[in-house]
Amino acid sequence: MWFKNLLTYRLTQDVPFEPEALEAALASKPARPCASQELTTYGFVAPFGKGADAPLVHVSGEFLLIAARKEERILPSSVVNDAVKEKVEEIETEQMRKVYKKERDQIKDEIIQAFLPRAFIRRSMIFAAIAPRLGLILVNSASAKRAEDLLSTLREVMGSLPVRPVTVKIAPAATMTDWVKSQHAAEGFYVLDECELRDTGEDGGIVRCKRQDLTGEEIQLHLSTGKVVTQLALAWQDKLSFVLDDKTVIKRLKFEELLQEQAEQDGGDEAQQQFDASFTLMMMTFTEFLPALFEALGGEEIPQGV
């Protein structure tokens, strides 16, 4: 269990997160298949294992892992629109009258209901790690929408979930731009060979650089004309590498082989033990990495009144 992307959320109040109580809460909204006339369903599943006995909360020391699954029927808008157009033309030709918006919308609803049972089904899972002592919820996604779907569903079953995205005191773009300009990142962090530069103007250009020396003259020239760094590939110590963007989203997270080998040694031969060992080691790494990252970005911003 190694996260590949990371969105970080701060608990603004103490939440006990007792495993037994959380298990019962998640069980009140299990994932289930779409009924014939449903577009989508959303619910919780076991992070590891299958079957009715698989726990919905994976506990490893002080850390908890949960997972949700979304199931949705895929109806391409082009297919629906073509069917609506065909039906409207048929009515207008046969009845020699104009079909207006209200009737067109009704036709569209009827066509969707007729197509739904035959639509393809897509399933997707999302994981979230809870670290109560740190006051953090970490979502394995680069999509704020997907993360909010999970958190809002968790809030629904728990009754309350006081949480907000982690923000930092200095704009990440300003910090990353300074690191590339000065050719020196914060302690423990190292600039790699990939970045995205954007002009700050309303219709400004975008420059994406991969496998390129970011200390070179070309990059420095872009920065001297006012472009800022909005994505930057970084490494932290000898433990992980990632791409950071200007909204503090961590993408393409990759743990170094030494960590993965350690997890394999700790986990032994059993799949569940391997899963538990990798999750535990990942979370222990995050307990060092995230405070260091927030500090490197100027420190975490705590809104007044929180």
UniProtKB/Swiss-Prot annotation:
Gene Ontology CC annotations of this record: bacterial nucleoid; cytoplasm
Record keywords: Cytoplasm, DNA recombination
GO BP terms, alphabetized: DNA recombination; regulation of DNA recombination
Disulfide bonds: none
Keyword Ubl conjugation attributed: no
Pfam families from the UniProt entry: RdgC (PF04381)
GO molecular function: double-stranded DNA binding
Family: Belongs to the RdgC family.
UniProt cross-references to NCBIfam families, sorted A to Z: PRK00321.1-2 (NF001461), PRK00321.1-3 (NF001462), PRK00321.1-5 (NF001464)
Protein name (database record): Recombination-associated protein RdgC
Biological source species: Pseudomonas entomophila (strain L48)
Gene name as annotated: rdgC
